[in-house]
Design a protein with these regions (language model features):
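Disordered, low-complexity "stalk" and linker segments at domain junctions of extracellular
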Residues: 1-31, 39, 68
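Helix-rich catalytic cores of soluble enzyme domains
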Residues: 24-66, 71, 77-92
Length: 166
């Protein structure tokens, strides 16, 4: 195949690759391509809560089978994946109403998710940043931080941003 021979390949030639998604990323440590809010296998319809990943170190293999680690998982809290932030230990996934931790587990499950908090918002895909291993984001009415637990940040900036802007 193209991955092992170095030959070219068109995206249309790859079987089961997600054709629509909200976010696409490459995991740092485990080397998977991950599509968030994407279409399911054999479907062109986007599922805004579905996460799919390619085989490890193989961007051409998206069909799960016994010889690879390609797979998928669907989140249950929220109606759409809005954004993601990669950290050293995990990928933090934001839906319109919750926050998840996504961690590489290895075969056979490959990736697992854990709900970190519900009834938590984010204003958009680019409202996330990481500094000193802490993930910060702006919700629709609060600022948040995650360093192992989700916390609401109380600060003067909050009042200015959420009360004074048009």
């Amino acid at each position: 195949d193209a991955a092992t021979t170095g030959s070219s390949c068109y995206i249309s030639d790859i079987v089961d690759v997600p054709t629509v998604q909200n976010v696409l990323m490459v995991s740092d440590a485990s080397r998977f391509i991950i599509a968030f809010g994407c279409n399911d296998y054999g479907s062109a319809t986007q599922d805004p809560m579905l996460i799919r990943w390619s085989g490890q170190e193989d961007p051409y293999d998206w069909t799960p089978d016994a010889t690879n680690q390609a797979g998928s998982i669907r989140l249950s809290h929220g109606s759409a994946i809005i954004g993601v932030q990669q950290t050293r230990q995990e990928i933090v996934v934001f839906t319109d109403s919750s926050v998840y931790s996504m961690q590489y587990l290895g075969a056979p499950q490959v990736w697992g998710t854990q709900l970190l908090g519900d009834n938590i918002s984010i204003v958009g895909q680019n409202a996330i940043a990481t500094a000193a291993n802490v993930v910060y984001w702006m919700g629709v009415d609060k600022f948040y931080a995650y360093d192992g637990t989700v916390q609401t940040l109380n600060c003067d900036l909050r009042r200015h941003v959420f009360n004074d802007f048009n």
